[in-house]
């Protein structure tokens, strides 16, 4: 094993340290025998030319200088800035003055860019409000109206109003929005539901998929594919008929399955992996293999300590962001070290459950429209996926779903992602019963269910609990007849959120729930955010079902 640091001997240049604490995995020696047909990075079909460049692409060495110098505490701040003039003119000016003795990078940025608008100070919580009243009054605070696209800004304009999570997140996010919508429906905000439905359909039409969020730097990846669940919600709440979205669902499916038909066993392309028996399963992916604009310095530091080619690490970090679980022991080879991330080598249980739902939704809506051939085709696809999941991702010995390391050909860790097959109706009753026992003994706490069993310092691990996981567990177990467990999780979670609200008068992104004393969840690449979209949505829906805690 190598363990050394390489330092630049020239003191006038930037010091470079590379941690080579890396031992070649014997399984990786086999990779040359596997053909992974990776696409060229930065190839995004259907992307309008005016929005093709991310801030890192547009500002080149200026972008790297700003991020490396840490002139903003949050790496996301500069990518969210909008230029006051043509970016090319800014870059030319920067190149002319950057070596001047009195050059001030912070002043240069402030003179040439509009800093992101901060909304958090606009709202002061009323301690007299109940939890329900607090959430209902927050919807307008978290709503952003459509606006003209500021030239060369990273923010992608949307045609209708939308909800943002809150805090540092001033754009809409794909899978967050579904859980936010649950609360909007409960609050009677059908107007916002319609707007968000139109926005997501518009993004599919214009970009061929729903990006991670409405920023140029998010266009190279998506997030957990929950549009089929959104469509189901629209239908249930009378917002929009499901039939009108059939073409959009098919387009999203094509995005996730791109390249599948040309793969041979043990081959992967973008999101698709052909398993040894010829079946198809999916993984998370990002078409770029560069540091994320919004976490540029953090990614560079992580890659520096990996001992692997940086582009591989960047791809896995980006794919981890696409998973929504950024980050978790689920994606780490060494659970205590983010630099060991291997997201693209895992077949995630939640992703494949969501795609099962997508296939089933296309089949169901096709049946409503009398498209029998399409219905039959997608019923077969859903059935084939369920069979493949049971072969590769179901741990029969322990009665749990687990992710699958397709390169090592072995099961990976157990986490709360295992409840998604129940939420989408993919499990059988025996699997649901056995999984319930595992969740009770391994993930359930007096505060809700943990993201995982492992304490790694990452935010999607123990001791944290997250609203979307609670909702899917509650509804998933109740769908299979385990009302006792579903209701217990619901009561525990409502108690957690309400107790914290009574003390702090706010809802937050994640909660520390391991010891029965609710407090702020830790971990992650950024400070804890309050607001918070999907917590508000899930809790508001639960209040409608269970009453105020």
UniProtKB/Swiss-Prot annotation:
Biological process according to GO: cellular hyperosmotic response; trehalose catabolic process
SUPFAM superfamilies linked to this entry: Six-hairpin glycosidases
Keywords recorded for this protein, A-Z: Cytoplasm, Glycosidase, Hydrolase
Family to which this protein belongs: Belongs to the glycosyl hydrolase 37 family.
Source organism of this protein record: Escherichia coli O1:K1 / APEC
Record field: catalytic activity: alpha,alpha-trehalose + H2O = alpha-D-glucose + beta-D-glucose
Gene3D superfamilies the UniProt entry points to: 1.50.10.10
Any single Pfam family the record assigns to this protein: Trehalase
Quaternary structure (record): Monomer.
InterPro entries (UniProt xref): 6-hairpin_glycosidase_sf, 6hp_glycosidase-like_sf, Cyt_trehalase, Glyco_hydro_37, Glyco_hydro_37_CS
PROSITE patterns the record matches: TREHALASE_1, TREHALASE_2
Keyword Cytoplasm: yes
The protein, known as: Cytoplasmic trehalase
Active site positions, chain numbering: 326, 509
